[in-house]
Amino acid sequence: MAPPLSPGSRVLIALIRVYQRLISPLLGPHCRFTPTCSSYGIEALRRFGVIKGSWLTVKRVLKCHPLHPGGDDPVPPGPFDTREH
């Protein structure tokens, strides 16, 4: 079971959700990765908290450009993940 979300994580997840609902539909599907960068960000914040989750999200977004091939890039397992990957 993952720890409860910090207020900072909740705020960042809410901002990502606003992007997903209001901005992303206007831009159309263009993410090179699976899961999308915004879904990755939400999952990273849930698994790792605001500091490490934000760092992982920023690194992911910086890789999202035409020179990177993209593909499957899941969030790494968190400290509370019990599933085998």
Swiss-Prot record:
Biological processes annotated in GO: protein insertion into membrane
HAMAP family: UPF0161_YidD
Record-given protein name: Putative membrane protein insertion efficiency factor
Localization terms from the record: Cell inner membrane
Disulfide bonds: none
Alphabetical list of PANTHER family matching this protein: MEMBRANE PROTEIN INSERTION EFFICIENCY FACTOR-RELATED
GO molecular function, one term: membrane insertase activity
Topology class, membrane: Peripheral membrane protein
Family according to the record: Belongs to the UPF0161 family.
Signal peptide stretch: none
